[in-house]
UniProtKB/Swiss-Prot annotation:
HAMAP family referenced in this protein's UniProt entry, alphabetically: NhaB
Sequence intervals crossing the membrane: 25-47, 66-86, 97-117, 130-164, 241-261, 304-324, 351-371, 390-410, 448-468, 476-496
Main function: Na(+)/H(+) antiporter that extrudes sodium in exchange for external protons.
Organism: Shewanella halifaxensis (strain HAW-EB4)
Annotated gene: nhaB
Catalyzed reaction equations: 2 Na(+)(in) + 3 H(+)(out) = 2 Na(+)(out) + 3 H(+)(in)
Cellular component per GO, a single term: plasma membrane
Family classification: Belongs to the NhaB Na(+)/H(+) (TC 2.A.34) antiporter family.
Keyword field: Antiport, Cell inner membrane, Cell membrane, Ion transport, Membrane, Sodium, Sodium transport, Transmembrane, Transmembrane helix, Transport
NCBIfam families: NhaB (TIGR00774), PRK09547.1 (NF007093)
InterPro entries, alphabetized: Na+/H+_antiporter_NhaB
Keyword flag Membrane: yes
Name under which the protein is recorded: Na(+)/H(+) antiporter NhaB
Organism superkingdom: Bacteria
Length: 528
């Protein structure tokens, strides 16, 4: 039967996505202009829900295409303007540069990171200790590198482990070329492979939560942290100190949760590394050590020095995050002899699709701001006073961040709170406390779903997710114990007065100074 033109168009539309998903996107595109004509506010919220739906269906179709079509239509029908979208991207240029350059920069340090994490896996046999190592090291790295960068590193490590095992288990040597995405090799033991997949899922989830535990602590840990720090006019050290009354107890609670879920093997955790797989990875490690040349050792040494520069540059805020990432690319490639254009291009493959998706997301933010979708929630939260106001903002941010990306939740909230400060509705000291509540509220409960955490979405849409059978639902289930513990400990730190009391102590000991409202007027308020 010949294929009709309409059938060919539908087949090509969104490629191999399920037919029901294609029809859903088409129906969204038809419905939105009609609803917008009658009620722009409802149409705006409908668009937000539809965009969240495309994020939730990330394994069916990468969200850039369906989300991008919704964003293009939103601009075309007047929900927002191209200039407002451009303004949002300009206001968040540091985040874009971070994604483009920092993630690519870490690509050229993956030999060192693969070396370190391979040693962790092969030298430490206790699954509980390995899990704690991955969680804590991810948290430490996220405090300096940005959570997205760290999860990109862990993904690289996991793909490395998986491909090594898959290659050898398929009857090939370490040096042979091999397609590790195909399971059609008769030598593979299905039970062993499933156990290894479960082991890698565990480590990736512990590492992912670790990035949230460390990422909330510093201004470079998460994209929205940079935005919040810029609005509040805080530098690296001040940001970390102000967050500490909430982030320190949350960190220890998170590490304890990691220990408990592994110890009691609940929520899909406790998967052991099969002995045969451990032997393959140990043999690979020994093979690499034996065949490591002077040139290879120099490369590892160079990458270690660049790592020191990276941490020092970020901690001392010597340049913007993206520019430090660019310096990492230049130093790593120059001193490791990578001068081929195609070799350079591979470093950008992982980050650029997500960067494009982030630009689409900023178009949705522009709609939220232009149609004032969050205004009722903000005004309701501001109607409370003192410590209760902090708790309300934490919970309101947390609930929204669970279902929508925490970057735009944090961006919208900090802008609205800053506007309230400039309008005289709140004091500067209360603004600073609210900024802490917003930052922790967007970072901690958002581990609930991949929609909230950019690093989790990055993991869900990465090459490793289908290999280890890490689906959206499975991520939500495995994140659940962390979601409950981190959210509750965070809200208790605010509710019981620890945030206000410790902040006052920091003022008294002059670790912090009181800012004036005037200090924030120089920074750009995104979306206004």
């Amino acid at each position: 039967m010949p294929v009709t033109m309409s059938r060919a168009i539908l087949d090509n539309f969104l490629g191999n996505s399920p037919k029901w998903f294609k029809l859903a996107i088409i129906s969204f595109l038809v419905i939105n202009p009609i609803v917008f004509y009658f009620n722009p506010f409802i149409a705006g919220w409908l668009l937000v829900v539809e965009f969240i739906f495309t994020l939730a269906m990330a394994l069916k179709c990468y969200p850039l295409q369906p989300g991008g079509l919704l964003a293009i239509e939103a601009v075309a029908i007047g929900m927002t303007s191209p200039s407002q979208v451009l303004h949002e991207i300009e206001a968040n240029l540091e985040v874009v540069l971070l994604l483009v350059f920092m993630v690519a920069g870490i690509y050229f340090m993956k030999q060192l990171l693969l070396f370190v994490f391979t040693k962790m896996i092969t030298k430490v046999r206790s699954k509980v200790y390995v899990s704690l190592l991955f969680c804590v090291s991810s948290a430490f790295l996220s405090a300096f590198l940005d959570a997205l960068t760290v999860i990109a590193v862990i993904i690289t490590v996991a793909v490395g482990f998986y491909s090594i095992y898959h290659r050898v288990a398929s009857g090939k040597s370490f040096a042979d070329s091999h397609d590790h995405t195909s399971d059609g090799h008769p030598q593979l033991c299905e039970e062993e492979l499933e156990s290894f997949r479960g082991f890698l899922r565990n480590l990736l989830m512990h590492a992912g939560v670790g990035t949230a535990l460390g990422g909330v602590c510093t201004m470079v840990g998460e994209p929205q942290n940079l935005i919040i720090a810029a609005q509040a006019n805080w530098q690296f050290a001040e940001f970390a100190i102000r967050m500490s009354p909430v982030t320190v107890p949350v960190f220890f609670a998170g590490v304890t949760t990691c220990f408990l879920v592994e110890k009691f093997k609940v929520f899909g955790y406790g998967q052991q590394l099969p002995e045969a797989v451990h032997k393959i990875l140990s043999d690979y490690d020994a093979h690499e050590d034996a065949n490591r040349t002077k040139h290879d050792k120099v490369k590892l040494l160079v990458q270690a020095f660049i790592g020191v520069w990276l941490i020092a540059g970020l901690a001392l805020h010597l340049a913007s995050v993206g520019l430090i990432g660019l310096s990492v690319i230049i130093l790593a490639t120059a001193f490791n002899g990578i001068t081929n254009e195609h070799a350079l291009g591979k470093a950008f493959e992982e980050a650029l699709p997500f960067t494009a998706l982030l630009a689409v997301f900023f178009a949705i933010v522009a709609v939220i701001i232009d149609l004032q979708l969050f205004a009722p929630v903000i005004q309701w939260a501001l109607s409370y006073e003192g410590n209760t106001q902090l708790v309300v903002f934490y919970i309101a941010n947390g609930l929204l961040s669970m279902v929508s990306d925490n970057v735009f939740v944090g961006t919208v909230y900090i802008n609205e709170v800053k506007a309230a400060l400039l309008n005289g509705q709140i004091t500067r000291d209360q603004f600073d406390l609210l900024a802490v509540a917003i930052n922790t509220g967007t970072n901690l409960p958002s581990v609930a779903t991949p929609n909230g955490q950019a690093a989790f979405l990055f993991l869900l849409t990465s090459a490793i997710a289908p290999l280890i059978r890490l689906s959206y639902g499975r991520m939500v289930w495995m994140a659940l114990p962390y979601t409950i513990v981190l959210s509750i400990v965070g809200v208790l730190a605010i509710q019981l007065g620890a945030l206000e009391q410790m902040t006052q102590y920091f003022y008294d000991t002059q670790l912090l100074i009181h800012h004036s409202a005037q200090a924030v007027t120089d920074s750009v308020v995104s979306g206004h």
